[in-house]
Amino acid sequence: MRRLLTGCLLSSARPLKSRLPLLMSSSLPSSAGKKPKQATLARFFTSMKNKPTEGTPSPKKSSKHMLEDRMDNVSGEEEYATKKLKQTAVTHTVAAPSSMGSNFSSIPSSAPSSGVADSPQQSQRLVGEVEDALSSNNNDHYSSNIPYSEVCEVFNKIEAISSRLEIIRICSDFFIKIMKQSSKNLIPTTYLFINRLGPDYEAGLELGLGENLLMKTISETCGKSMSQIKLKYKDIGDLGEIAMGARNVQPTMFKPKPLTVGEVFKNLRAIAKTQGKDSQLKKMKLIKRMLTACKGIEAKFLIRSLESKLRIGLAEKTVLISLSKALLLHDENREDSPDKDVPMDVLESAQQKIRDAFCQVPNYEIVINSCLEHGIMNLDKYCTLRPGIPLKPMLAKPTKAINEVLDRFQGETFTSEYKYDGERAQVHLLNDGTMRIYSRNGENMTERYPEINITDFIQDLDTTKNLILDCEAVAWDKDQGKILPFQVLSTRKRKDVELNDVKVKVCLFAFDILCYNDERLINKSLKERREYLTKVTKVVPGEFQYATQITTNNLDELQKFLDESVNHSCEGLMVKMLEGPESHYEPSKRSRNWLKLKKDYLEGVGDSLDLCVLGAYYGRGKRTGTYGGFLLGCYNQDTGEFETCCKIGTGFSDEMLQLLHDRLTPTIIDGPKATFVFDSSAEPDVWFEPTTLFEVLTADLSLSPIYKAGSATFDKGVSLRFPRFLRIREDKGVEDATSSDQIVELYENQSHMQN
């Protein structure tokens, strides 16, 4: 077959009759006395002649397009022939042979056809760049020969059940199974389970695939028209189901080589890292290669992975628990034991070990490899925070009154700091002298602040190898020497920032140090950490300063300090335990050892909420032409769903409404996503991809038959009363939205206070 295909293309510029002798002699190598496989030739031409088409055939197509469309269906044993054909295709441009019928010339192209053939140079470049993307991503540590179909079968089982314990059992059993074959299978498999391509702080891992691109790819790969795909999508709202249905009824010329976990994961990373000219075409080519090889339910979950939403009710913390159980059994060589149960206290200890490790080193590859090398029960010794990897920041619980603060810290030594109205900034100095700045959700935002150089704030560079600081980046007026509102900070560019372009200066207000010269400080008291901070760093007015603080338990002094913080353009106070184990830094935890007291929220629920924009309602009157209101939802961390909690239309300026219209309109989708939990009576005029968070104030919370937040806890959902827009949260991803559990907790605390 390899010779046959090569012969077909090499002779493609000749009339069909003159090519037949060559084709008839180009069968597979045969032993002496064996006749050429003419039946194979007949099937080959018949499949091309009978290829279903739509639209008007182009009078001339590039041979590269014709070839790649046909070769999207070739893999496995035909890989050699594919490469040879691609090398040859770019030197030929052919017209459709009339004797084979017009169907041959109208084989659908994967690239937009203008009726003009690509030049050989353009064709060669596109093919080469696609293969470069694949080869450059060929990392051995992501290799896995586990059939992708096995992962999809697990996803299918999980989708059909709701019991969290059963999901944990299914996941842990599968992790144990693949570790028996090879422990290297675990890393790419885990990333597929949590639907990520690497750690959050690694740049360039956003797939960036819109619905239209995926629809077009499914259309061209599966021989369906765009109108058919869109009609079906409007009906069922699941591109994965559509791709599975279309793929399973489509015949292929060759039996594709089965997909593996390693292949799928590497290709997903290659798609994410594909940028620049023709990037969309190159991404489509990579998707087609996988989609063509999909069987059964594989297409369904491949497309969902490409959408970055599996929608099977598998939360990341469930995967972490499953991993801890599997790794614990792996350590104890109990995978084959008929009784895999382990004592609950041991299992809970293993779960806590892996949670703590991941909060300090949010990188599954490092955490899993450390477990495999040292054992999960030794993670706290070998897998700890390190400069260059952003740990998940400690967070504070909201409170509504100074009396509540005094009650919480009664008999304890505590301290209060200004709560600055800026952007959380975790600053790392690395051994090689480079600096990195990370946001609260782990995004590398070093390039956003070119004017900051941490080495300017170090007391002794000769003795300081590395460190990690916890700070707030605040807009600063250098002329008047004062803090500017957050709205001023938000006007700074977020990408491609040049030093000469900086108009809004920032000052770093440091309030904690977490690591110094490889010494982990999070298990020291806040009082000790403050001593480290002032010893190794120095104040540079207007550039690097310490958070203003006071240590007192006097009610009047605290009230005065709160008023002063507001007068200095701050949000309020952060009140923290100062001494003892309770003052240790707890990565990722929203702890009652840190309380936030915001002046604006003393009469409300005690805190603002960060809610995801799910849809919008058209404006009327003076708001005609923009959106007049928005449907907001919280995030359920257990199910991965967004649960509606209010409609908001207050707090917006005309300028903000126009900005939101321009920002959100490109994200409109045809209907609600399967992860949106809502009541039809609150259905908006348009639905959006979940991309944007609003920070919202509310007077209080109430139960509602219309909204769905926390409905798993109550008979009704929890809704916000009189919500008011504050700002867009640029520093948070949508999965960092206020959770359903947090809304339930706020409602219960409010009810308790009222009673």
Swiss-Prot record:
Record field: catalytic activity: ATP + (deoxyribonucleotide)n-3'-hydroxyl + 5'-phospho-(deoxyribonucleotide)m = (deoxyribonucleotide)n+m + AMP + diphosphate
CDD domains given in the database record: Adenylation_DNA_ligase_I_Euk (cd07900), OBF_DNA_ligase_I (cd07969)
Region (Interaction with target DNA): 309-318, 493-495
Matches recorded under InterPro entries: ATP-dep_DNA_ligase, DNA_ligase_ATP-dep, DNA_ligase_ATP-dep_C, DNA_ligase_ATP-dep_cent, DNA_ligase_ATP-dep_CS, DNA_ligase_ATP-dep_N, DNA_ligase_N_sf, NA-bd_OB-fold
UniProt superkingdom: Eukaryota
Binding site for Mg(2+) 2: 571
PROSITE patterns, sorted: DNA_LIGASE_A1, DNA_LIGASE_A2, DNA_LIGASE_A3
Amino acids binding ATP: 417, 424, 440, 576, 590, 596
Biased composition range(s): Low complexity: 102-114
Cofactor: Mg(2+)
Positions carrying Phosphoserine: 58, 75, 119, 123
Compositional bias ranges of the Polar residues kind: 47-60
More details: Cdc9 is included within the category of so-called 'start genes', encoding proteins which are required in early G1, when the cell is faced with the option of initiating a further cell cycle. Present with 149 molecules/cell in log phase SD medium.
Name the UniProt record assigns to this protein: DNA ligase 1
